[in-house]
Amino acid sequence: MISKIDKNKVRLKRHARVRTKLSGTAEKPRLNVYRSNKHIYAQIIDDVKGVTLAQASSQDKDIANTSASKVDLATTVGQEIAKKANDKGIKEIVFDRGGYLYHGRVKALADAARENGLEF
């Protein structure tokens, strides 16, 4: 009998494999994306110090009150994380898609962050 593939387990293995090659510094921190079925989260992380520099999610008060589609919420989260990064003087980042395909909500977040001043 063929067992069913656990997609999240495969994603976590892919993410771990990529993270060995991908790291953020103070000059060029890492933009990490986590996507659940209902929400999307983004963090800008300095891996050298192990510190989160900025974060935004679809559960933030100003974002969660809008009744929009999940892709629209991801776009808003991308705009918000870019605004917070610009306030802290962060212009360049390393994009970590978290093992997810660069499509849909992850792509919408990345495109919105690029349009609002982040370079990656």
Curated annotation (Swiss-Prot):
Keywords: Ribonucleoprotein, Ribosomal protein, RNA-binding, rRNA-binding. It holds the Pfam family Ribosomal_L18p. GO terms for molecular function: 5S rRNA binding; structural constituent of ribosome. Gene3D superfamilies: 3.30.420.100. GO terms for cellular component: cytosolic large ribosomal subunit. It comes from the Bacteria. GO terms for biological process: translation. InterPro entries: Ribosomal_uL18_bac-type, Ribosomal_uL18_bac/euk. HAMAP family: Ribosomal_uL18_B (MF_01337_B). Part of the 50S ribosomal subunit; part of the 5S rRNA/L5/L18/L25 subcomplex. Contacts the 5S and 23S rRNAs. Belongs to the universal ribosomal protein uL18 family. This is one of the proteins that bind and probably mediate the attachment of the 5S RNA into the large ribosomal subunit, where it forms part of the central protuberance. This is Large ribosomal subunit protein uL18.
